Amino acid sequence: MIPASGPLFNEVIHSPVRLRICALTRRISELEYAVIRDTLGLSDANLSKNLKVLSDAGLVSMRKESSPERTDARKLTWVGLTEKGRAALEGHLAALSQIAEGTGEAGDTSD
């Protein structure tokens, strides 16, 4: 895993929906799209839009897989944090903690 370089505020992760997605996938390798959608109470469009932002930033990976339980051609989408995503989330959480405790200013990784 790529180590976090300390508290770094991340604008991409900071969006409430994206923060919740990252937190949900933080301690597991991957989750199925519908599980994330249903757990967070999101619409397909909202989840898809936010996963695209995270994916474009290299913070999550997505893969499609056929399901033997489905009778149609649709595939399941699996979502997981990348190593970069895990490191960014850890740095962001540390930055939020530092901000909440008033112990210093966290750097911002967005340009």
Region spans (language model):
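Short, hydrophobic-biased segments on the C-terminal half of alpha helices
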Residues: 51-52
